[in-house]
Structure formats: structure tokens, C-alpha cells
Amino acid sequence: MEDATYGYKVPLLFIIISVLFVSAVVIIAPIVSSVHTIDEASFRIVVRSGLIYKLGEESPYTGHIVDTLESKIIKYDVVNGLKHGEFSISTLEGNFSVCGFVEKNKNVGSWKYFYDDGRLESVGSFIDDKPQGNWIWYYKSGKVKSEGNYLSGKAEGRWVKYDERGNMNLMIYYSNGEIVSEVKFSLPQFI
């Protein structure tokens, strides 16, 4: 995930996660994918009217789903046909890519995003599927890359970007997702 100073990665990553989920559930799962419950019983799932069902059953599914898609493992719980509870995407090697919570198919609470090697990339919260509150992004070194706040899914207030040495190099002020002002900082370059 990226901060609002880049203006695209938070919504882009959310879209990618949504597309991966929809692809797994709507397109791939009914055709070719096996989905497993905790007890390893295989079955196919389908989505009807926004609810998840076991193929051939009339009642919405409740249980745990583990699926694979494009070398990623997707795990989540389903209650009465809706994603509800822990949600994670991890690599085949076991490193998390994304982990968070879902209530009635909407992202809520704290979410963490990771680099492919398992190191933390960003952390923030969602309310009703929209980024909310303080979000922090990290370099692979673990140093803070940028931080800022969301209000109802839109960048709000002061956002700061740092270089890899920890020096502030950009400060942007947002109001309702729109840039109000921007200040760039530069340090003298020593040879």
C-alpha cells in the first residue's frame, strides 16, 4: 500500500484485493478451484446475490475457506454467506501479504500489508470498507516511509513523507481528499 502522496496505492491495493477475491469466488471457484474447510473436505463455492454458497446447496455457507490464486493463499471465514472474521492473503512460503478483519463483506479494524519477504509495508484501519485514521508505510529497512490520516476513505490533514535516512522530504495537507498545500524539503547534497 502507498500513501496519499502517491495518490494511488491504497485504492489500487484495495481494488486488487477485491478483484482477487471476486475472481476466486465468482469466476475461478465454480469452474476449477477446490476450496477446503479446516477438516480438508473439498467443495466448490458459488456467489449468488452477494452471498457465498456451496455448489448445489440452497442455504448460504458458514465455515472457513482456504483457496489459492496466482501463487497466493487466501483464507477467510464465512457466516451466513458473508465474509466475516479474519482475512489473510499469504505467499506459498507462508509470509503474509495482507491480514485484517472483515464484517459482512466489509473491511474493518486494523489491517497490515507486507512486502513479499514478510516485512511490514503498511498498517492502518478501515471502517465500513474505507481507510480511516492514521496509516503508516515503511521502507523494507523498517524505517517510516510516510504517514497520514484518512477520514471516511479520503486523505485528511497532514501527511509526511521521509527519505530512507528518516529525513522529512515532503509534507502535504489534505482536506476531504484534496491537496490544500504542499511543502518539499531538501537537504544539501555533500560530495
Positions of the model-derived regions?
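Periodic aromatic/glycine/histidine/acidic cluster detector
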Residues: 2-115, 119-139, 143-151, 156-161, ...
